[in-house]
């Protein structure tokens, strides 16, 4: 199957398997051996499948144009399924109409599938797994993992305050990656990592013993996935596939901070529980998220 990707990015061609910044859509492109085009480009050949991310500033993007050179056209979810409801009403309607005109809707989680099926009554909504292109990582150093890292800062999008309260209940020092929406005074409570590309991030994450990511904004779930690949137990909220499938013993109901505190205490004080969660995360990553599993939802296209 020949696949093309259409986004607002300006380059044309394929992403190498060793790309240093292998974010979600790049990983999809690599796994599908897809050629990338800017959404304004006109390919000089016909593709079996075209996948596009609906532009935020132009949600009325004309999928009929893509159908001229793609036998089927799919839209890829980006961000939480409710994100478009912060658009103007006009653009919300345009976004909805673009969704319904696609042949396939690819989504991140089982809960997203339920949402989009109900919203659009679309007959072909598929969960397309998040994945990691492991070639890009290279060799990891043997390190003695220490401390705790959270998946985001102090904004509601990342649920950073929830994560901090849980992490700080067992660890005096809490580390977090620097995010785009930085809050004044964050450095007084947490150690912020500098901005880094995806490869650098994986190598840095490998130094930590426990992950906490109590993020209510469910999308691709890369933090829980990255932790699972490394065998780092990660505490997170229910509703995110990567969290539930890779860290089932560490998944709590949204808002159940008390249960999360109990889990981090047990991880920190019971080597038996920690080692079991670590082993389980690695094994379940291989079962659910290795690259070979990714293409299973393309059958029948």
Feature-to-residue mapping (PLM):
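Conserved acidic donor-binding segment of nucleotide-sugar-dependent glycosyltransferases
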Residues: 248-258, 265-271
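A charged, aromatic-enriched C-terminal amphipathic alpha-helix characteristic of glycosyltransferases
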Residues: 269-301
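Membrane-proximal helix-turn-helix segments that form the acceptor-binding/catalytic region
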Residues: 87-105
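Active-site proximal beta-strand in glycosyltransferases
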Residues: 49-54, 64-84, 106
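N-terminal pre-catalytic "stem/leader" segment of glycosyltransferase-like enzymes
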Residues: 1-63, 249-253
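Donor nucleotide-sugar binding/catalytic pocket of nucleotide-sugar-dependent glycosyltransferases
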Residues: 103-117, 121-138
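Acidic donor-binding loop of glycosyltransferase active sites
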Residues: 206-219, 232
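Conserved catalytic-core segment of nucleotide-activated headgroup transferases in glycan assembly
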Residues: 17, 21, 134-198
């Amino acid at each position: 199957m020949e696949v093309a990707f259409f986004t607002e990015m300006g380059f044309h061609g394929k992403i190498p398997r060793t790309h240093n910044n292998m974010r979600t859509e790049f990983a999809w492109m690599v796994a599908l051996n897809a050629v990338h085009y800017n959404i304004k480009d006109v390919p000089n050949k016909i593709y079996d499948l075209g996948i596009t991310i609906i532009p935020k500033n132009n949600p009325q993007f004309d999928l009929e144009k893509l159908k001229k050179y793609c036998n089927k056209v799919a839209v890829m979810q980006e961000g939480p399924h409710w994100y478009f409801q912060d658009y103007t009403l006009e653009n919300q309607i345009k976004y909805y109409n673009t969704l319904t005109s696609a042949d396939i809707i690819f989504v991140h989680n089982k809960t997203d599938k339920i949402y989009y099926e109900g919203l659009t009554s679309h007959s072909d909504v598929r969960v397309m797994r998040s994945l990691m292109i492991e070639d890009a990582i290279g060799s990891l150093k043997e390190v003695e993992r220490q401390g705790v890292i959270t998946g985001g800062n102090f904004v509601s999008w990342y649920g950073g305050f929830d994560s901090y309260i849980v992490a700080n209940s067992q660890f005096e020092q809490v580390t977090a990656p620097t995010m785009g929406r930085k809050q004044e005074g964050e450095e007084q409570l947490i150690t912020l990592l500098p901005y880094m590309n995806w490869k650098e991030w994986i190598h840095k994450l490998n130094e930590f013993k426990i992950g906490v990511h109590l993020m209510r904004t469910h999308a691709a779930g890369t933090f829980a996935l990255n932790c699972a690949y490394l065998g780092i137990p990660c505490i997170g909220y229910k509703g995110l596939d990567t969290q539930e499938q890779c860290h089932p013993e560490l998944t709590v109901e949204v808002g159940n901070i008390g249960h999360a505190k109990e889990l981090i205490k047990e991880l920190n004080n019971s080597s038996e529980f920690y080692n079991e969660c670590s082993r389980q995360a690695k094994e379940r990553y291989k079962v659910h998220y290795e690259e070979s599993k990714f293409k299973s939802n393309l059958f029948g296209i």
